[in-house]
Design a protein with these regions (language model features):
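Functionally important transmembrane alpha-helices
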Residues: 208-228
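Terminal transmembrane helical anchor/hairpin motif
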Residues: 1-22, 86-91, 95, 221-304
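Alpha-helix N-cap/start motif
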Residues: 142-143
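Secretory targeting signals
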Residues: 53-115, 121-122, 147-214
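Transmembrane helix boundary and interhelical loop/hinge segments in multi-pass membrane proteins
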Residues: 119-136
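Membrane-embedded or membrane-proximal helical elements that form or frame transporter/channel pores
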Residues: 1-58, 81-116
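Membrane-interfacial segments
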Residues: 124-128, 167, 171-179, 212, ...
Length: 304
Protein backbone atom coordinates (compact mmCIF):
# COMPACT_ATOMS: atom_id res chain seq x y z
CA UNK A 1 0.00 0.00 0.00
CA UNK A 2 2.88 2.35 0.76
CA UNK A 3 4.32 1.88 -2.75
CA UNK A 4 0.94 2.20 -4.48
CA UNK A 5 0.15 5.31 -2.45
CA UNK A 6 3.49 6.89 -3.36
CA UNK A 7 2.93 6.19 -7.08
CA UNK A 8 -0.84 6.85 -6.97
CA UNK A 9 -1.24 3.67 -9.00
CA UNK A 10 -3.44 1.05 -7.35
CA UNK A 11 -4.36 -2.36 -8.74
CA UNK A 12 -7.84 -3.86 -8.39
CA UNK A 13 -9.22 -7.07 -9.87
CA UNK A 14 -12.80 -6.61 -11.11
CA UNK A 15 -13.97 -9.84 -12.78
CA UNK A 16 -10.56 -11.36 -12.07
CA UNK A 17 -8.58 -9.04 -14.35
CA UNK A 18 -6.10 -6.39 -13.21
CA UNK A 19 -7.21 -2.76 -13.45
CA UNK A 20 -5.10 0.29 -12.61
CA UNK A 21 -6.80 2.97 -10.49
CA UNK A 22 -5.61 6.57 -9.95
CA UNK A 23 -7.12 8.57 -7.08
CA UNK A 24 -7.82 12.26 -6.62
CA UNK A 25 -5.78 14.36 -4.20
CA UNK A 26 -8.53 14.17 -1.59
CA UNK A 27 -8.78 10.39 -1.85
CA UNK A 28 -4.99 10.14 -1.70
CA UNK A 29 -5.02 12.03 1.60
CA UNK A 30 -7.58 9.57 3.01
CA UNK A 31 -5.42 6.63 1.90
CA UNK A 32 -2.46 8.24 3.67
CA UNK A 33 -4.46 8.40 6.89
CA UNK A 34 -5.53 4.76 6.48
CA UNK A 35 -1.90 3.78 5.90
CA UNK A 36 -0.86 5.38 9.18
CA UNK A 37 -3.65 3.55 11.00
CA UNK A 38 -2.66 0.25 9.37
CA UNK A 39 0.91 0.66 10.60
CA UNK A 40 -0.39 0.80 14.16
CA UNK A 41 -2.81 -2.13 13.80
CA UNK A 42 -1.92 -5.08 16.01
CA UNK A 43 -4.90 -7.35 15.28
CA UNK A 44 -6.66 -8.50 12.12
CA UNK A 45 -9.83 -6.68 13.13
CA UNK A 46 -8.02 -3.36 13.52
CA UNK A 47 -6.24 -3.94 10.20
CA UNK A 48 -9.58 -4.61 8.48
CA UNK A 49 -10.97 -1.41 10.00
CA UNK A 50 -7.98 0.60 8.75
CA UNK A 51 -7.87 -0.82 5.22
CA UNK A 52 -11.61 -1.16 4.59
CA UNK A 53 -11.99 2.51 3.54
CA UNK A 54 -9.09 2.09 1.10
CA UNK A 55 -10.93 -0.72 -0.68
CA UNK A 56 -14.05 1.46 -0.88
CA UNK A 57 -12.09 4.38 -2.33
CA UNK A 58 -10.71 2.05 -5.01
CA UNK A 59 -14.16 0.79 -5.94
CA UNK A 60 -13.75 -2.66 -4.37
CA UNK A 61 -12.08 -5.84 -5.64
CA UNK A 62 -8.69 -4.80 -4.23
CA UNK A 63 -6.18 -6.57 -2.00
CA UNK A 64 -7.39 -4.40 0.87
CA UNK A 65 -10.86 -5.86 1.29
CA UNK A 66 -11.34 -8.04 4.36
CA UNK A 67 -11.52 -11.32 2.43
CA UNK A 68 -8.10 -10.72 0.85
CA UNK A 69 -6.07 -9.57 3.84
CA UNK A 70 -4.61 -13.05 4.32
CA UNK A 71 -2.53 -12.38 1.21
CA UNK A 72 -0.38 -10.06 3.33
CA UNK A 73 0.42 -12.91 5.71
CA UNK A 74 3.54 -14.20 3.99
CA UNK A 75 6.37 -16.26 5.40
CA UNK A 76 9.42 -17.73 3.66
CA UNK A 77 9.30 -21.42 2.79
CA UNK A 78 11.34 -23.61 5.06
CA UNK A 79 14.19 -25.59 3.54
CA UNK A 80 12.13 -28.78 3.88
CA UNK A 81 9.14 -27.18 2.11
CA UNK A 82 11.33 -25.84 -0.68
CA UNK A 83 12.90 -29.26 -1.21
CA UNK A 84 9.49 -30.93 -1.21
CA UNK A 85 8.18 -28.43 -3.79
CA UNK A 86 11.26 -28.95 -5.94
CA UNK A 87 10.94 -32.73 -5.69
CA UNK A 88 7.32 -32.63 -6.82
CA UNK A 89 8.18 -30.40 -9.78
CA UNK A 90 11.09 -32.57 -10.89
CA UNK A 91 9.72 -36.06 -10.18
CA UNK A 92 5.93 -35.89 -10.37
CA UNK A 93 5.43 -32.90 -12.69
CA UNK A 94 8.64 -33.62 -14.59
CA UNK A 95 8.81 -29.86 -15.19
CA UNK A 96 6.25 -29.77 -18.03
CA UNK A 97 3.41 -30.57 -15.64
CA UNK A 98 4.07 -27.29 -13.83
CA UNK A 99 3.76 -25.28 -17.04
CA UNK A 100 0.80 -27.38 -18.17
CA UNK A 101 -1.24 -26.31 -15.13
CA UNK A 102 -0.63 -22.64 -15.91
CA UNK A 103 -1.55 -23.29 -19.55
CA UNK A 104 -4.78 -25.05 -18.49
CA UNK A 105 -5.70 -22.17 -16.18
CA UNK A 106 -5.45 -19.58 -18.95
CA UNK A 107 -6.94 -21.79 -21.67
CA UNK A 108 -9.97 -22.57 -19.50
CA UNK A 109 -10.74 -18.85 -19.16
CA UNK A 110 -10.94 -18.60 -22.95
CA UNK A 111 -12.86 -21.80 -23.69
CA UNK A 112 -15.42 -20.99 -21.00
CA UNK A 113 -16.88 -18.22 -23.15
CA UNK A 114 -15.60 -18.40 -26.75
CA UNK A 115 -17.30 -21.70 -27.80
CA UNK A 116 -20.71 -20.38 -26.73
CA UNK A 117 -20.28 -17.37 -29.03
CA UNK A 118 -19.14 -19.55 -31.93
CA UNK A 119 -21.95 -22.10 -31.60
CA UNK A 120 -24.75 -19.54 -31.21
CA UNK A 121 -23.43 -17.60 -34.23
CA UNK A 122 -23.14 -20.87 -36.17
CA UNK A 123 -26.75 -21.86 -35.38
CA UNK A 124 -27.98 -18.33 -36.08
CA UNK A 125 -26.34 -18.41 -39.52
CA UNK A 126 -28.07 -21.72 -40.27
CA UNK A 127 -31.40 -20.20 -39.31
CA UNK A 128 -30.86 -17.07 -41.40
CA UNK A 129 -29.98 -19.23 -44.39
CA UNK A 130 -33.06 -21.40 -43.70
CA UNK A 131 -30.88 -24.51 -43.54
CA UNK A 132 -32.46 -25.84 -40.33
CA UNK A 133 -35.88 -26.83 -41.85
CA UNK A 134 -34.14 -28.71 -44.66
CA UNK A 135 -31.90 -30.64 -42.26
CA UNK A 136 -34.76 -31.41 -39.90
CA UNK A 137 -36.86 -32.79 -42.75
CA UNK A 138 -34.24 -35.43 -43.59
CA UNK A 139 -34.61 -38.95 -42.26
CA UNK A 140 -32.06 -38.60 -39.47
CA UNK A 141 -32.92 -38.95 -35.81
CA UNK A 142 -32.44 -35.95 -33.55
CA UNK A 143 -29.90 -37.72 -31.28
CA UNK A 144 -27.64 -38.66 -34.19
CA UNK A 145 -27.96 -35.25 -35.82
CA UNK A 146 -27.24 -33.31 -32.61
CA UNK A 147 -24.44 -35.55 -31.33
CA UNK A 148 -22.72 -35.40 -34.73
CA UNK A 149 -22.81 -31.60 -34.80
CA UNK A 150 -21.78 -31.37 -31.15
CA UNK A 151 -18.83 -33.74 -31.57
CA UNK A 152 -17.67 -31.94 -34.72
CA UNK A 153 -17.91 -28.57 -32.95
CA UNK A 154 -15.97 -29.78 -29.91
CA UNK A 155 -13.27 -31.29 -32.12
CA UNK A 156 -12.95 -28.09 -34.14
CA UNK A 157 -12.76 -25.92 -31.03
CA UNK A 158 -10.27 -28.24 -29.34
CA UNK A 159 -7.79 -28.11 -32.22
CA UNK A 160 -6.49 -24.58 -31.36
CA UNK A 161 -6.04 -25.69 -27.74
CA UNK A 162 -3.98 -28.70 -28.80
CA UNK A 163 -1.91 -26.63 -31.23
CA UNK A 164 -1.15 -24.12 -28.47
CA UNK A 165 -0.20 -27.01 -26.17
CA UNK A 166 2.20 -28.30 -28.82
CA UNK A 167 3.84 -24.89 -29.24
CA UNK A 168 4.27 -24.48 -25.49
CA UNK A 169 5.72 -27.98 -25.19
CA UNK A 170 8.32 -27.05 -27.78
CA UNK A 171 9.16 -23.92 -25.82
CA UNK A 172 9.66 -25.88 -22.58
CA UNK A 173 11.84 -28.43 -24.37
CA UNK A 174 14.08 -25.58 -25.53
CA UNK A 175 14.23 -24.14 -22.00
CA UNK A 176 15.26 -27.46 -20.40
CA UNK A 177 17.49 -29.37 -22.85
CA UNK A 178 18.34 -32.86 -21.67
CA UNK A 179 15.84 -32.82 -18.78
CA UNK A 180 13.52 -35.75 -18.12
CA UNK A 181 10.29 -34.11 -19.27
CA UNK A 182 6.73 -35.40 -19.45
CA UNK A 183 6.04 -34.85 -23.14
CA UNK A 184 2.33 -35.58 -22.71
CA UNK A 185 1.72 -33.15 -19.82
CA UNK A 186 0.21 -30.35 -21.91
CA UNK A 187 -2.08 -32.74 -23.77
CA UNK A 188 -3.18 -34.42 -20.54
CA UNK A 189 -3.95 -31.00 -19.10
CA UNK A 190 -5.95 -30.12 -22.22
CA UNK A 191 -8.01 -33.30 -21.93
CA UNK A 192 -8.41 -33.48 -18.18
CA UNK A 193 -8.61 -29.78 -17.25
CA UNK A 194 -9.67 -27.75 -20.30
CA UNK A 195 -11.94 -30.17 -22.18
CA UNK A 196 -14.76 -30.38 -19.55
CA UNK A 197 -15.07 -26.58 -19.58
CA UNK A 198 -15.12 -26.65 -23.38
CA UNK A 199 -17.80 -29.38 -23.35
CA UNK A 200 -20.04 -27.27 -21.11
CA UNK A 201 -19.64 -23.99 -22.99
CA UNK A 202 -20.30 -25.76 -26.31
CA UNK A 203 -23.38 -27.48 -24.89
CA UNK A 204 -24.62 -24.14 -23.55
CA UNK A 205 -24.38 -22.75 -27.08
CA UNK A 206 -26.60 -25.49 -28.54
CA UNK A 207 -29.01 -25.44 -25.59
CA UNK A 208 -29.46 -21.67 -25.62
CA UNK A 209 -30.07 -21.71 -29.38
CA UNK A 210 -32.73 -24.39 -28.98
CA UNK A 211 -34.25 -22.58 -26.01
CA UNK A 212 -34.20 -18.96 -27.19
CA UNK A 213 -33.39 -19.09 -30.94
CA UNK A 214 -31.34 -15.92 -30.48
CA UNK A 215 -28.28 -14.56 -28.66
CA UNK A 216 -29.88 -14.48 -25.19
CA UNK A 217 -27.88 -17.54 -24.14
CA UNK A 218 -24.66 -15.63 -24.80
CA UNK A 219 -25.61 -13.06 -22.17
CA UNK A 220 -26.35 -15.84 -19.68
CA UNK A 221 -23.00 -17.49 -20.37
CA UNK A 222 -21.20 -14.18 -19.89
CA UNK A 223 -22.90 -13.88 -16.51
CA UNK A 224 -21.78 -17.38 -15.52
CA UNK A 225 -18.26 -16.62 -16.74
CA UNK A 226 -18.06 -13.36 -14.78
CA UNK A 227 -19.33 -14.96 -11.57
CA UNK A 228 -16.80 -17.78 -11.92
CA UNK A 229 -13.98 -15.33 -12.58
CA UNK A 230 -14.88 -13.19 -9.55
CA UNK A 231 -15.04 -16.21 -7.23
CA UNK A 232 -11.81 -17.66 -8.60
CA UNK A 233 -10.03 -14.31 -8.25
CA UNK A 234 -9.99 -14.69 -4.47
CA UNK A 235 -7.32 -17.41 -4.74
CA UNK A 236 -5.95 -17.69 -8.28
CA UNK A 237 -2.90 -19.76 -7.28
CA UNK A 238 -5.08 -22.71 -6.28
CA UNK A 239 -8.88 -22.73 -6.23
CA UNK A 240 -10.90 -25.68 -7.53
CA UNK A 241 -14.14 -26.47 -5.65
CA UNK A 242 -17.04 -26.39 -8.11
CA UNK A 243 -15.68 -23.61 -10.30
CA UNK A 244 -16.34 -24.00 -14.02
CA UNK A 245 -12.83 -22.54 -14.42
CA UNK A 246 -10.55 -24.18 -11.81
CA UNK A 247 -7.80 -21.70 -10.99
CA UNK A 248 -4.08 -22.44 -10.65
CA UNK A 249 -2.36 -19.37 -12.03
CA UNK A 250 1.09 -20.21 -10.67
CA UNK A 251 4.12 -22.31 -11.48
CA UNK A 252 4.31 -23.23 -7.80
CA UNK A 253 1.85 -24.30 -5.08
CA UNK A 254 2.48 -27.84 -6.33
CA UNK A 255 1.64 -29.46 -3.00
CA UNK A 256 -1.82 -27.88 -3.10
CA UNK A 257 -2.47 -29.38 -6.53
CA UNK A 258 -1.62 -32.94 -5.52
CA UNK A 259 -3.38 -32.59 -2.15
CA UNK A 260 -6.58 -31.48 -3.91
CA UNK A 261 -6.27 -33.61 -7.03
CA UNK A 262 -9.32 -35.72 -6.16
CA UNK A 263 -11.34 -32.53 -5.66
CA UNK A 264 -10.30 -31.32 -9.11
CA UNK A 265 -11.10 -34.72 -10.65
CA UNK A 266 -14.62 -34.67 -9.17
CA UNK A 267 -15.04 -31.11 -10.44
CA UNK A 268 -14.07 -32.08 -13.98
CA UNK A 269 -16.23 -35.22 -13.96
CA UNK A 270 -19.17 -33.21 -12.64
CA UNK A 271 -18.97 -30.66 -15.44
CA UNK A 272 -18.60 -33.39 -18.05
CA UNK A 273 -21.85 -34.91 -16.78
CA UNK A 274 -23.45 -31.45 -16.76
CA UNK A 275 -22.53 -31.04 -20.43
CA UNK A 276 -24.29 -34.35 -21.16
CA UNK A 277 -27.38 -33.13 -19.28
CA UNK A 278 -27.40 -29.90 -21.30
CA UNK A 279 -27.09 -31.93 -24.49
CA UNK A 280 -30.02 -34.11 -23.42
CA UNK A 281 -32.19 -31.05 -22.76
CA UNK A 282 -31.23 -29.69 -26.17
CA UNK A 283 -32.29 -32.99 -27.72
CA UNK A 284 -35.72 -32.78 -26.06
CA UNK A 285 -36.26 -29.20 -27.27
CA UNK A 286 -35.17 -30.07 -30.80
CA UNK A 287 -37.59 -33.01 -30.91
CA UNK A 288 -40.38 -30.65 -29.89
CA UNK A 289 -39.30 -28.23 -32.62
CA UNK A 290 -39.32 -30.96 -35.27
CA UNK A 291 -42.83 -31.90 -34.17
CA UNK A 292 -43.93 -28.26 -34.38
CA UNK A 293 -44.69 -28.06 -30.65
CA UNK A 294 -42.01 -25.52 -29.72
CA UNK A 295 -40.57 -22.54 -31.58
CA UNK A 296 -38.28 -21.05 -28.98
CA UNK A 297 -38.74 -18.77 -26.00
CA UNK A 298 -38.54 -15.16 -27.15
CA UNK A 299 -38.20 -12.15 -24.86
CA UNK A 300 -40.33 -9.29 -26.15
CA UNK A 301 -40.96 -5.81 -24.72
CA UNK A 302 -44.25 -5.37 -22.91
CA UNK A 303 -47.05 -3.76 -24.93
CA UNK A 304 -48.37 -0.41 -23.78
Amino acid sequence: LKEEHADNAYVTYPFGFAKSVTLTAGAQAKVGQALNQARQADTRRSLEKALGPVDQLLGGHSDYQAANLQRFAVRPMTLAEARHDHTLIMRKDRITGTYARLFADIASIIVCILPTIVIIAYCYTDRRAQVRPTMQAKAMGTPKWLVTRYAASVAGLLIPVLMTALLLLGRVILLYPGAALDYWAFFKAAGFWVLPTLLVSTAVGFLSDALFSNFTGFALQIGWWLITMMIGAHQVIGNYGWLLIPRHNSLHNVSFFYAHYSELAINRLGYTLLAIVFLGLTMVLMNLQREGKYRGFHLRPARR
